């Protein structure tokens, strides 16, 4: 009993209580995000959209105890894994939002409130009829631009080359973003380039290791909010 009540205390502290609209991952317009209430402090704010099993965010949060981290994930099993990893690593600076990312960006986060936002290995939705479900789109980029501070950083990675090209196209066309690595990695086949070197803060996750074993390499992109 003690163990489960301790776990429930951790859950209450780490998992945000979000007002819902329709579903259990929706975010009502009255939702708020007050870092002082949530973390007990104002600090450098990192948001990961689609934190999966939590490997990337827990690793970085342990390296940067002075920063506030928000993991956004819809799937309960992923959140359970993430909470376990947080407990094992003893990190106190991560909070978890079980929420649809577009609604969270629209309804919960303030304008110009985020220093760094990550989208690592989002679902590629391979079938062309499903491409409209892909997260990174012009409309999603608008939402990210609203919450990022001027000078804020958007880091992206995918192991699907075709999706990487789509991400780059979306962000190159967006008036509020500039590529941190313009022209980098350009080739004859791909004269535009603009690929980021692998960011040292992004740990090698089990997901990426599987992609490597299948012969797919990660494509990184880094953009700055103008």
What do these predicted ranges mean?
Residues 1-7, 11, 160:
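Single conserved hydrophobic/aromatic residue that forms the stacking wall/gate
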Residues 48:
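Class I SAM-dependent methyltransferase core
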Residues 54-55:
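Glycine-rich SAM-binding Motif I of class I
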Residues 75:
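Conserved SAM/SAH-binding beta-strand->alpha-helix loop
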Residues 83-111:
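S-adenosyl-L-methionine
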Residues 136-150:
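A short glycine-rich, Lys/Arg-flanked "PGG" loop and its adjoining helix->strand segment in the class I
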Residues 150-158:
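Conserved beta-strand signature within the Rossmann-like core of class I S-adenosyl-L-methionine
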Residues 169, 173-226:
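Class I S-adenosyl-L-methionine
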């Amino acid at each position: 009993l003690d163990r489960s009540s301790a776990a429930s205390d951790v859950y209450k502290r780490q998992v945000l209580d979000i007002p819902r609209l329709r579903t259990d991952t929706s975010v009502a317009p009255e939702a708020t995000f007050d870092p002082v209430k949530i973390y007990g402090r104002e600090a450098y704010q990192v948001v990961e959209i689609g934190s999966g099993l939590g490997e990337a965010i827990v690793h970085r949060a342990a390296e940067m105890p002075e920063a506030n981290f928000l993991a956004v994930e819809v799937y309960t099993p992923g959140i359970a894994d993430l909470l376990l990893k947080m407990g094992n690593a003893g990190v106190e600076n991560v909070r978890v939002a079980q929420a649809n990312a577009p609604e969270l960006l629209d309804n919960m986060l303030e304008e110009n409130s985020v220093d760094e936002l990550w989208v690592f290995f989002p679902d590629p939705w391979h079938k062309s009829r499903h491409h409209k479900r892909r997260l990174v789109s012009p409309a999603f980029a608008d939402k990210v631009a609203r919450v990022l501070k001027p000078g804020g950083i958007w880091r992206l990675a995918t192991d699907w080359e075709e999706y990487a090209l789509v991400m780059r196209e979306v962000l190159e066309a967006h008036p509020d973003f500039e590529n941190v690595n313009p022209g980098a990695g350009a080739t004859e086949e791909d004269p535009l380039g603009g690929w980021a070197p692998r960011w040292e803060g992004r740990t090698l996750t089990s997901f990426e290791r599987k992609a490597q074993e299948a012969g797919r390499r990660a494509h990184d992109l880094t953009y700055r909010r103008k």
